[in-house]
């Protein structure tokens, strides 16, 4: 893991666990997210459209076995689902602003169920301009939600009602590569979801994107 991002992530975890450093921890979280966002934006400036569909590690195991377009989709679908359906209990940005049609996506899920050539085919269908609009909007809305949370809310568990709501939306595929996400998220408290979905998950997939980029443009 990138040393700078890793250190920031560790700092976030330490700071948000204590009430007297919680606000500082949220500031550190936003700093990390801004740094990672700069990398994701750089792809739009530096890469050709077809580069977003490239899958140079198609037979590998790991986050780098995807495409850059898929990775961006995946990061922000998960964030949107977790932030709105599970934490804020309101409508996802994806549905509120008609992003399935705007992005031209054949799916509404996180994409965990897709493999190999399916990932490439999926990536090629996406409207990148709208995909980037989506990520900006999700990032902003998530950060508004995080700012509204008090330290005491971090230990709040996800209710059974929320879990059933999540299932009913069909935003997580029933495929074995995806369905585990529902229990994984719903067994965490709000603090755990913030530390994974809004920070560490970003790091892992952004690093994978850089690995893909460096492979296709050595």
Predicted regions and their residues:
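Terminal targeting/low-complexity segments that flank the catalytic cores of oxidoreductases
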Residues: 1-42
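Short, contiguous alpha-helical
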Residues: 1-11, 54-113, 140-143, 147, ...
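A structural signal for alpha-helix termini and helix-coil/disorder junctions
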Residues: 14, 18, 42, 46-49, ...
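A short, mixed-charge helix-start or loop-turn motif at secondary-structure junctions
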Residues: 22-26, 61, 120-125, 187-191
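Alpha-helical packing segments of well-folded alpha/beta enzyme cores
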Residues: 25, 32-43, 78, 124-127, ...
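Short, contiguous, well-structured surface segments enriched in hydrophobic/aromatic residues
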Residues: 35-51, 173-176
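Cytochrome P450 catalytic-domain helical core, especially the substrate-recognition surface
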Residues: 112-120
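Acidic, Ser/Thr/Gly/Pro-rich intrinsically disordered interaction regions
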Residues: 122-132, 151-165
């Amino acid at each position: 893991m990138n040393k700078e991002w890793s250190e920031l992530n560790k700092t976030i975890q330490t700071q948000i666990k204590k009430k007297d450093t919680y606000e500082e921890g949220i500031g550190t979280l936003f700093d990390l997210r801004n740094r990672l966002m700069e990398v994701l934006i750089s792809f739009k400036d530096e890469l050709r459209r077809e580069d977003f569909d490239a899958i140079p590690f198609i037979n590998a195991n790991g986050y780098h076995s995807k495409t850059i377009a898929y990775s961006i989709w995946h990061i922000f679908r998960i964030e949107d689902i977790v932030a709105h359906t599970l934490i804020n209990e309101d409508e996802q940005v994806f549905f509120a602003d008609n992003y399935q049609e705007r992005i031209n996506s054949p799916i509404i899920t996180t994409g965990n169920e897709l493999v190999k050539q399916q990932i490439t085919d999926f990536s090629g269908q996406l409207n990148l301009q709208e995909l980037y609009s989506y990520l900006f909007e999700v990032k902003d809305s998530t950060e508004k939600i995080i700012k509204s949370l008090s330290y005491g809310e971090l230990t709040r568990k996800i209710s059974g009602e929320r879990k059933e709501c999540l299932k009913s939306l069909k935003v997580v595929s029933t495929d074995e590569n995806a369905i585990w996400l529902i229990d994984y998220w719903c067994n965490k408290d709000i603090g755990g979801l913030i530390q994974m979905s809004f920070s560490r998950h970003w790091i892992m997939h952004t690093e994978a994107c850089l690995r893909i980029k460096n492979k296709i443009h050595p």
